[in-house]
């Protein structure tokens, strides 16, 4: 006879005692709760966390993720000397920023000179860091690239060890990090910054560093200074031609909200019958432009074009558009401006955290807030210096 298989005894379902029936969530029943309580205890903490700790820049021009990365690199003595592996920087940053390595590396890439998203990059990079104007150009892994702080970062950390800003605990309370960086120039208007929070967003376009500094000095001397006379227009990293009128720009400067058009720059090569596009709007990519032009050709809306190629190389961006014989390049470009992202809009929403409160401000109000904050940094530095000298004087008098 075949041996009988031993059947394992089945476990009896756990019994719920009478006293456990009063445990909330143990019984399958609908718990009624006013929607106001749900918003207060569930939605609001999440929304405020995203607004304050993630998406909206502060008066120094940085989000927390940017600040943690740059301060870590400063602590690694990367303001001078040789570059180090990006993976080394990412690993060290995790002591202040409890995110994955991919998120931290993405932050570093977007601040790098190689990526080209900022007028004045903070990370001096070496290796393939991709390009801001390319959607499909992937950057190399952190183990292959190297980085250090760019020279301009000396102005971000000047006097940081002289009590110019507050230091707070990191996420586990084992390290200290600055709540703000004591930037000696209005970085909030120099470095382009974009963030999407819960119920609000921020979109700050960059301006010329020299113009911003001149405007700040003029405002300190005369609070009624005409800002448009010294800050002529925004300055975008990818170039292009800005299309706006004075009324539109004044509205942006006064309210912190508005938009303007940005048009690609191009040239015509008669010998080759080719249009070369060498600067594009900041808000689009070369792939998006090529895809749209190809779509127009297939639909028969751009019959003058025989081919389009992305010839971007180490010398810079270049889109080559081959024209058919007898085509007028001016008319072709006017059509492409109308139907493709070669002409795009740039939105402005100057939403900044001031003392933990999000505020949409115009350029004048934003610079005045920066001046007030910077004066406080200088005052704290002087008080620190006086205290150190007083201690030294006390010791000398004791001798």
Protein language model regions, located:
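Catalytic phosphate-handling regions of large nucleic-acid enzymes and associated NTPases
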Residues: 2-256, 318-320
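C-terminal interaction appendages of subunits in large macromolecular complexes
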Residues: 2-17, 26-30, 34, 194-196, ...
């Amino acid at each position: 006879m075949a041996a009988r298989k031993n059947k394992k005894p089945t476990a009896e379902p756990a019994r719920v005692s009478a006293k456990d029936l009063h445990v909330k969530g143990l019984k399958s029943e609908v718990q009624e709760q006013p929607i106001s309580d749900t918003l207060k205890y569930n939605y609001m903490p999440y929304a405020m966390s995203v607004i304050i700790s993630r998406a909206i820049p502060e008066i120094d021009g940085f989000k927390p993720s940017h600040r943690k990365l740059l301060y870590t690199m400063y602590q690694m003595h990367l303001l001078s000397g040789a570059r180090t592996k990006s993976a080394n920087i990412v690993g060290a940053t995790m002591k202040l920023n409890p995110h994955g390595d991919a998120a931290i590396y993405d932050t570093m890439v977007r601040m790098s000179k190689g990526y080209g998203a900022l007028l004045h990059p903070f990370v001096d990079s070496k290796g393939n860091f991709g390009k801001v104007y390319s959607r499909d150009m992937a950057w190399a892994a952190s183990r292959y690239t190297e980085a250090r702080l760019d020279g301009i970062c000396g102005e971000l950390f000047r006097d940081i060890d002289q009590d110019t800003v507050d230091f707070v605990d990191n996420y586990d309370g084992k390290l200290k990090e600055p709540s703000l960086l004591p930037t000696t120039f209005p970085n909030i208007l120099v470095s382009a910054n974009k963030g999407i929070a819960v119920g609000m967003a921020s979109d700050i376009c960059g301006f010329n560093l020299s113009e911003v500094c001149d405007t700040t000095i003029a405002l300190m001397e005369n609070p009624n200074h005409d800002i448009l006379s010294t800050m002529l227009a925004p300055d975008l990293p990818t170039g292009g031609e800005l299309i706006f009128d004075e009324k539109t720009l004044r509205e942006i400067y006064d309210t912190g909200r508005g938009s303007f058009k940005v048009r690609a720059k191009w040239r015509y090569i008669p010998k080759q019958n080719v249009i070369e596009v060498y600067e594009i709007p900041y808000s689009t990519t070369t792939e998006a432009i090529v895809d749209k032009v190809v779509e127009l050709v297939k639909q028969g809306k751009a019959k003058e074009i025989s081919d389009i190629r992305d010839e971007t190389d180490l010398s810079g961006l270049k889109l080559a558009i081959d024209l058919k014989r007898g085509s007028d390049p001016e008319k072709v470009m006017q059509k492409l401006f109308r139907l493709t992202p070669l002409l795009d809009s740039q939105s402005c929403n100057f939403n900044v955290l001031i003392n933990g409160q999000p505020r949409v401000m115009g350029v004048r109000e934003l610079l005045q807030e920066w001046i007030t904050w910077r004066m406080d940094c200088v005052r704290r530095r002087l008080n620190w210096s006086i205290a150190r000298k007083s201690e030294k004087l006390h010791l000398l008098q004791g001798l």
